[in-house]
C-alpha cells in the first residue's frame, strides 16, 4: 500500500485474514461477518458484505485461530470504500473493549511483529 507523502501511521499493521463479526450499536440485529485485511493495536481494516456510515459505533468479535476465546473490541467506523455492491472496505478505530481482549490482541501483535522483526506497538487505549 502506498502512503501519501507526510502520512505516518501510529501503529504497525499486520496483514492477516481472520474472520470478524461486526455488530453496529445499538442495532444488534444487523450483525454481519467479514474478514480482516489488516489490523493493528489501533484498529482494523475489514472486507464486509454490507456498508456502515462513518462514525458508526460497532462491537467487533475477532476469531483468532488456535485460541480458545474470541477477542471482543469496541470501535467506530473511520472510513468506508465500496468495491462493489457486496464488497466494502471498512476501517474501524478501536475505542475500547474488555481488558482481556485488549491484552490478547497486544500479545498476538507482538508475536506476529516479532516474527517479522518489527518493534511492537503501544497498547490499545482504554
What are these model-derived regions, one by one?
Residues 1-39, 106, 110-126:
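N-terminal helix initiation/capping motif
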Amino acid at each position: 500500500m502506498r502512503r501519501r507523502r507526510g502520512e505516518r501511521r501510529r501503529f504497525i499493521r499486520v496483514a492477516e485474514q481472520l474472520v470478524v463479526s461486526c455488530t453496529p450499536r445499538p442495532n444488534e440485529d444487523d450483525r454481519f461477518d467479514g474478514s480482516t485485511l489488516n489490523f493493528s493495536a489501533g484498529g482494523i481494516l475489514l472486507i464486509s458484505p454490507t456498508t456502515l456510515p462513518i462514525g458508526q459505533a460497532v462491537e467487533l468479535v475477532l476469531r483468532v485461530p488456535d485460541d480458545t476465546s474470541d477477542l471482543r473490541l469496541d470501535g467506530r467506523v473511520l472510513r468506508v470504500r465500496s468495491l462493489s455492491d457486496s464488497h466494502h472496505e471498512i476501517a474501524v478505530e478501536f475505542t475500547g473493549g474488555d481488558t482481556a481482549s485488549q491484552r490478547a490482541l497486544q500479545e498476538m501483535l507482538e508475536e506476529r511483529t516479532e516474527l517479522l522483526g518489527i518493534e511492537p506497538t503501544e497498547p490499545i487505549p482504554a
